[in-house]
Amino acid sequence: GNILLEQENIEITESNCSGHAETSLMIKASKKYSKDFLWNCTLYSTAEPCAMCAGAIYWGNVGKVVYGISEKRLLELTGDDEQNPTFDLPCREVFARGQKDIKVEGPFPEVENEVVEVHKDYWNK
C-alpha cells in the first residue's frame, strides 16, 4: 500500500487540545477522501488511539487501525503529564459500541522498545 497522509501531534505547536496525531490526520483525510475510500484504508499509529481519536477514526470511516503500543503502556510513559490525561478505554471498546466493524491490530511487542524511545523523547522534553 501507499502512504496517503502523515501527521504528528499538534496539540502544543498549534495550541489545539484536540490536536492528537490521529484526530488531526482524520480531519485532513476527511477533507481529501470519500468515506467509501477511507473504509478501505488503514491508519497506522505508534500508540493505541485514545477515545477521542478512536471517535474521529470511527466517524471518518477508516476500516482498520494498527498500533505499536497500548494506551496503558503510553500512560506508563506519560504518567500524570497534563498533556495526556487519558482514559482507561481501549480503542477496541470504543469501536465495539458503534455500528461499524473496524479492524484493530496491536499492540506489537516486537516494536515496543522502538516506540517507547520515540515517545520518551516527546514526553520528557
Language-model segments: residues:
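A structural microfeature
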Residues: 4-7
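A short acidic/small-residue loop/turn micro-motif
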Residues: 10-13
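A generic helix-loop boundary/linker signal
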Residues: 15-16, 105
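Short HxH-centered metal-ligating active-site micro-motif
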Residues: 17-52
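Zinc-dependent deaminase
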Residues: 56-125
